[in-house]
């Protein structure tokens, strides 16, 4: 009985984490698209990128691609953003 409850708890946390990640990805994608179009950083995107990519670079980019839940071997980052 206890193992069943523990598995249920793990499943609930996993699904909650997936929902949280999906909300984050949706906002990130929207902010990247907005910055690419306008050349103006949102506060969230500026905080996240920490000055490593300028708004002007995103505006001049041929494409900005966001790949979520990428598996890079032993590490599993949340997402990879590629700027072309």
UniProtKB/Swiss-Prot annotation:
Pfam short name (any one): Herpes_UL24
Entry-linked InterPro entries: Herpes_UL24 (IPR002580)
Taxonomic superkingdom: Viruses
Family: Belongs to the herpesviridae UL24 family.
Record-given protein name: Protein UL24 homolog
């Amino acid at each position: 009985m206890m193992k069943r409850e523990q598995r249920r708890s793990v499943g609930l946390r996993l699904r909650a984490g997936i929902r949280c990640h999906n909300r984050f990805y949706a906002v990130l994608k929207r902010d990247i698209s907005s910055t690419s179009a306008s050349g103006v950083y949102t506060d969230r995107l500026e905080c996240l990128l920490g000055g490593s990519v300028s708004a002007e670079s995103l505006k001049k980019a041929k494409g900005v691609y966001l790949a979520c839940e990428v598996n890079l071997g032993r590490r599993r980052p949340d997402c990879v953003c590629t700027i072309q």
